[in-house]
Amino acid sequence: VFVSANMKYPNEIENSGLAALPPKVYAFGKLVLWSMRDGFQPSLDNLKAPTVRHIALANPKVAPYGMAAEQVMQKHSLLPELQEKLVFGESIAQTNQFITTQSAEVGFTAMSVVLSPTLQGKGQWTPLSPELYTPIEQGVVLIKRKEKENSAARRFYDFLSSSTAKAILQDFGYEVEEGL
């Protein structure tokens, strides 16, 4: 099973003939602004504050959450003004490190991160309207095996569409739809 923060790689696996079943979207990620600074309320307006010198986001060329962050800033005409403050992580994990270590005063990340058991309740975060960015499709594909079929992998692939999985995903800040 290959699980991805977008559909690009699951689709590439299918196009390469390596998928046992078609890739599918199992949830949609949500974008938030997050800060570990005491007394700082993350908001798009507050990104312009002179006390904010670094804004973390994942590299928009390769990371879906970085692409979404860039879209939000473009829709609010903030990108030119904030360009000098932007600090790019090569992944959402590195971006989160910039935020949690306060190397960046604020950053764009996944809601699932701020709701995770190890980080829940740390810092302040603000959800950003999903209307401001292209939906962040979370994808999964079942990969072919040369040997016998892996029934555990198939069960997990199917589980991601179950009501139990959807409830778990919602608890961790993902959006799920009935048709998924």
What function would you assign to each model-found segment?
Residues 1:
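Internal catalytic or translocation cores that form aromatic/hydrophobic pockets or channels
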Residues 4-17, 22-180:
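Exported/periplasmic ABC-transporter solute-binding proteins
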